[in-house]
Amino acid sequence: AVLNGNALAIMVALVPAALVNQLLGAMTLNGVVTSLAMMVTLAQSALPLIAAFTVGTMLKLGMMETASMALATLAGSGVTTFKDGTFTLAGSGVILNVMLTTAVAGLVAMGATKVLGQLRVVFEPLIVLVVAGGIGLMTLPGMVAVQAAVGQVVASATAAAPLVMG
């Protein structure tokens, strides 16, 4: 469910930008082009939220659990930065960390539902956010390094491909 949900979220959040950005580059800047660019960029940044909702749905969780997962995934994804009292939303986050955080958030949400009973309405969002989002924030630097290393390997393989095929 975690892999399928994240794969679907990647398709929903990232494919529109991949399709439209190529077309927008060839167009003259005007209000419509600027609005389209803003919409697809915002869709990319919504990847952590979409991932949490797709994974939560595939795990057959309720709205409270799924929304709590979305909070935790947004917090742990790396899509937001906080500097000088201001939050900045940029990019789609670290996809590996989005996947890890959705998995942890799903487990925490399922556990909290069983343990908290009627108190879950009050405490579940906080527990899922603090535990799963906190784990996401702690693993973020390591996942950034892993993602960068994978990117370097892919870039090297892409650069070497003409030589190998030569």
Model-derived features with residue positions:
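Signature of multi-pass transmembrane helix bundles
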Residues: 1-166
